[in-house]
């Protein structure tokens, strides 16, 4: 086990009756890094997160989080982590600030209002602080959810498919929030089925397939697993998501460099009947 690993998983197994979900999973997450667990639906990503969060007991293997064993020291693990599920766990009746204050008080922290205001500013939600969460966009709800999970400054945070169901603009908002977490030293383990999300965010990526980690490394290391590509000079066409973000001014550069005149529709020409 690496000394500076915030999360260590070795030989992890889990079955539901006859269904073997995890078949000997091994990986480590370095402190202060973003680690992406990439896999299709049903690969076992959420099962791993639930075990790491002490919500589910493993059948076999050794799992430690922040130096604590998830089975023998579950209470210590829960003090060290925060979990954000696939859907934002926010109270729609309350305002954004009230949600944060409530969590701070439930954790018996002093200065709940100050904590709330600091997180609102950190996640660019100050202007919406007094609005009910029911009026928030999907991206705003997810950012608030992540902000709530940081109350108490947990060293490790688990994000289970944090952009599920979000539009491209909201996904970009969440991506920026996740990058901010790592810059401040928080260890982030996120699960995703979006390849571009893992590519953009993660320091290391593990691919989970049929209950096993079949590849684990940096993006550059994973690319080395493919045979050398044949060099061809082609014009790179933007993806639809890149077009959408550029047109709406959310391409990450803060500018809109789109030639809107080219977007004007022209009726198709038709031949006159003879």
Question: What annotation goes with each model-predicted range?
Answer:
Residues 216-217:
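ABC ATPase "signature
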Residues 61-72, 76-77:
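Conserved ABC transporter NBD signature motif
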Residues 157-161:
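Catalytic Walker B motif of ABC-type/P-loop ATPase nucleotide-binding domains
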